[in-house]
């Protein structure tokens, strides 16, 4: 009796291996592969300060109008809060609040705000008269109310509305955020970014650059945020949140 047995050719049967053998019928564990080297991520050197200049070294950043409005709301808020801290002796004055709002006021602590052509009212809700009137109503109501005489109490309406918060937080959105988003950033993609607005008069920034910077100016007046500029409004609320967490906070000049 003659017996025959078949012998399968052994080798690497994995087509992904370096030594794949198309003739092999049985894998013998000899497959070899290239070592997988993970890609090396690019490295970036993030400066601690950014300075934006044109080709001639002229500074292209300007947002003084926004800084003025932040200062105005800061002084208005401080005035509103005096009704909470004076033991009932400081009755707010409606004409003071209203004149602070439209900047006909002359009693600013920072006298540079007097008659500087900037105001909060005209920039509220992109000029919506109804929204402006609502803020003026709150100012008048706050002035008509009797200041609290007990420590720890706050000036508020019978329904629980705290006028200082309504006015301060309301203008942070209706003025500052409205201007950022609805005025400056909404159409920035179509702004010119090739030529200076008016270099002869010191406006070395392009239209796009200026609109971006003015939007930033409503966030904070600080050029080294968050090293400074964390004491008020949106700069205060954003501090220690995402920007600081991801380490992207740098100075702007």
Predicted regions located by residue number:
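Bacterial Sec-dependent N-terminal signal peptides
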Residues: 2-56
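Mature extracytoplasmic or organellar-lumen-exposed domains after removal of signal/transit peptides
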Residues: 36-253
